[in-house]
Regions:
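N-terminal cationic-hydrophobic initiation segments that often serve targeting/anchoring roles
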Residues: 168, 214, 286, 335-339, ...
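Carbohydrate-interacting/catalytic domains
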Residues: 1-136, 144, 157-172, 436-439, ...
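Conserved alpha/beta catalytic core and glycan-binding cleft of carbohydrate-active enzymes
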Residues: 104-105, 290-292, 307-475, 480, ...
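Short, flexible loop/turn elements at secondary-structure junctions
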Residues: 36, 62, 72, 142-147, ...
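Glycine-rich, histidine-containing beta strand-loop boundary motifs that form or position
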Residues: 46, 70, 83, 179-182, ...
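Short glycine-biased active-site loop of nucleotidyltransferases that positions the nucleotide triphosphate
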Residues: 59, 187-191, 235-242, 359-360, ...
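Substrate-binding/active-site clefts of carbohydrate-active enzymes
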Residues: 124-133, 142-323, 587, 604
Length: 636
């Protein structure tokens, strides 16, 4: 404990507790330290002592920390802490700071030396830039169900690293977001009910194996974001619950302690030792595993005292409000600590309400995140896509309302795992109609998503044209790639993702009106929207998306500048499963025909249930009137 800052631990500002607490090798053995302030006694138990609580008692130090050293142990030996409560009850607890753990159904911690991995991502780390004005196309992955062995076994971290990094890079994703890999006991929780906040789940291998996973992603230029869950923890006896016989990590107040809807406990954000535990966990993943960001789960449940609670089940804060002031302070401290570790980190909030200033700096009164999932856009789009195209005209605002607030925060547009489970249908399954209409609907939607302001996230499997919902206990329907239509869908994803990555107009100005302009926002009868994306350096892309099964050969609208427009991408391309009959094969020239309140306009072809992207080139002088032409083309 020579370098341990007890004041920082108590005060809730420590970010490196994992270097002291937990189990660490010494010249003479392994030293164990655990925080159990209410315990009557604590000992270390394991296979090495036949789990005898009397074999290796620990001595109590300042701050409720217990310590002992045991000789003759080896890496991977299993252990727990035998914690005796004031009542005399003894519970065997996993180490909250363990680096490694048994694979379920085992619940013991394992000795592990974290040092020694030889990283090869130095060039990637040196080239990192802030996320704001660069492309971010995220492939969300559940490692256990992306792909399985023929016998149903999981792939390990190293095999996943090799295959997934190649696959994601080939498909045009430059980031993967992992559903939680912090150790968890129940597969059905998908990782969102954790027990090990410092241990990558042993389902897929060791800590060094997970380091290899991140390393290989980085070597292929792919960032890695981890879902991280500070909102609640599971109630398994070997975990954090009532750690020393009384609430330690959770609130003692019964009106704050339980999250009844999830059957979990809520962290005590007002207790310094708990804040330090969580801050150290976040910093640990960023620092020791070179992760590029954390997506913080269920932020709304942290911010509101009445979240999931009825009247009488919660107590107002000192100001009489329903905000959890301690959680607000914690989130600000979390983001401050994360940016201290990595100034280019991505701190992403899953916040489902209209809480203000989520992605504003702490110094400006914000929570300090730099990205936030746009749940409103996601809900509107999922509702819209399920509608029969004839009814979509009555819900056109679902397409356009997001631009009323698109620049109020730094948004990520998510089509996440939550939208393809619990009878919600896969992305393709949300679309009405036959196979052709469903796949065409996916293509048009993906163009809309990738060209709409904001960073992007798509859950695995959409690129296969998968019909079935996600099944965490299986794998993606890879067999679909035996079908021509599904291969073409995957080819489309590859092409449109790569197009996004290589065109700055689609990402350089994602959080300001300077990067976006509506050309047609109110054509509800045709289920069509048209807009321009700009990069601020003269490049313009015109995007037209048609959510109707009717194609348009001469769709006219006003344009702000006199340019020639050339089609660069069409969802009707035969390579993607389209018909090839609805293309803008020739350059489209601006004409001196007023439309939509503008002096000049163009007329283009838009495929049924399709989308086109055209690039503008050249700005022209106003032409002289020519009486011989009713529709005068501006010179090229």
């Amino acid at each position: 404990m020579e370098h341990f800052d007890l004041a920082a631990f108590y005060g809730g500002s420590a970010t490196e507790l994992y270097r002291t607490l937990g189990a660490h090798r010494t010249p003479d053995g392994w030293v164990f330290r655990v925080w159990a302030p209410h315990a009557g006694s604590v000992s270390v138990v394991g296979d090495f002592c036949a789990w005898d609580p009397t074999a290796h008692p620990m001595r109590r130090l300042d701050g409720g920390i217990w310590e002992t050293e045991v000789a003759g142990l080896s890496e991977y030996d299993t252990y727990k802490f035998a914690v005796t409560a004031q009542s005399g009850a003894v519970t065997f607890k996993a180490d909250p700071y363990a680096f490694h753990a048994e694979t379920r159904p085992g619940t013991a911690s394992k000795l592990y030396e974290l040092a020694g991995y030889d990283w090869g991502d130095g060039a990637y780390l040196a080239a990192k830039q802030p996320v704001y004005d660069r492309p971010l196309n995220i492939y969300e992955v559940h490692l256990g169900s992306w792909r399985r062995r023929e016998n149903g076994d999981f792939y390990d971290y190293r095999s996943l690293a090799d295959e997934l990094s190649e696959y994601a890079a080939d498909l045009g994703y430059n980031c993967v977001e992992l559903m939680p890999v912090t150790e968890y006991p129940l597969d059905d929780s998908w990782g969102y009910q954790c027990t090990g906040y410092f241990a990558p789940t042993s389902r897929y291998g060791t800590p060094h194996d997970f380091m290899y996973f991140v390393d290989m992603m980085h070597r292929r230029g792919i960032s890695v974001i981890l879902d991280w869950v500070p909102a609640h923890f599971c109630k398994d006896e070997h975990g954090l619950i009532d750690f020393d016989g009384e609430p330690c990590y959770e609130y003692a107040d019964p009106k704050k302690r339980e999250h009844a809807g999830w059957g979990t406990r809520v962290f005590d954000y007002g207790r310094g030792e708990v804040k330090s535990f969580l801050l150290s966990s976040a910093a640990y993943w960023l620092r020791e595993y070179h992760l590029d960001g954390l997506r913080v789960d269920a932020v709304a449940s942290m911010l509101y005292l009445d979240y999931g609670r009825e009247a009488g089940e919660w107590t107002p804060n000192k100001n009489g409000g329903h905000e959890n002031l301690e959680a607000i302070d914690f989130l600000r401290a979390l983001n401050t600590a994360a940016f201290a570790v990595d100034p280019n980190v991505m701190m992403v909030a899953e916040e489902s309400t209209a809480w203000p200033l989520v992605t504003y700096p702490v110094s400006d009164g914000g929570l300090g995140f730099n990205l936030k999932w746009n749940m409103g856009w996601m809900n509107d789009m999922c509702h819209y896509l399920k509608l029969d195209p004839w009814f979509r005209q009555f819900h056109h605002k679902d397409l356009t309302f997001s631009l009323m607030y698109a620049f109020s925060e730094n948004f990520v547009l998510p089509i996440s795992h939550d939208e393809v489970v619990y009878m919600k249908g896969s992305l393709r399954g949300k679309m009405p109609g036959d196979e052709w209409r469903q796949l065409a609907g996916v293509r048009s939607f993906m163009v809309y998503m990738l060209t709409h302001p904001g960073k992007k996230l798509t859950f695995m499997g959409a690129e296969l044209g998968q019909w079935h919902e996600w099944d965490f206990a299986g794998q993606l329907d890879w067999y679909l790639l035996e079908n021509d239509a599904n291969r073409r869908m995957q080819d489309f994803f590859r092409a449109v993702n790569r197009y996004y990555l290589t065109n700055p107009a689609l990402w350089r100005i994602d959080f300001d009106w300077a990067g976006f302009e509506w050309l047609v926002a109110d054509d509800n009868e045709d289920n069509t929207v048209v807009f321009v994306r700009r990069d601020g350096a003269g490049e313009e892309l015109l995007v037209a998306v048609n959510f109707s099964p009717n194609g348009y050969r001469d769709y006219r609208f006003g344009v702000p500048q006199r340019k020639t427009w050339r089609e660069e991408l069409s969802t009707d391309d035969t390579a993607f499963g389209g018909t090839g009959e609805w293309r803008n094969e020739k350059p489209v020239r601006t004409q001196a025909i007023p439309s939509h309140g503008r002096e000049q306009s163009i007329a283009i072809t838009i495929p049924p249930l399709g989308a086109v992207i055209l690039r503008g080139a050249g700005e022209y002088k106003k032409p002289k009137a020519k009486k011989s032409k009713a529709r005068e083309e501006l010179p090229a």
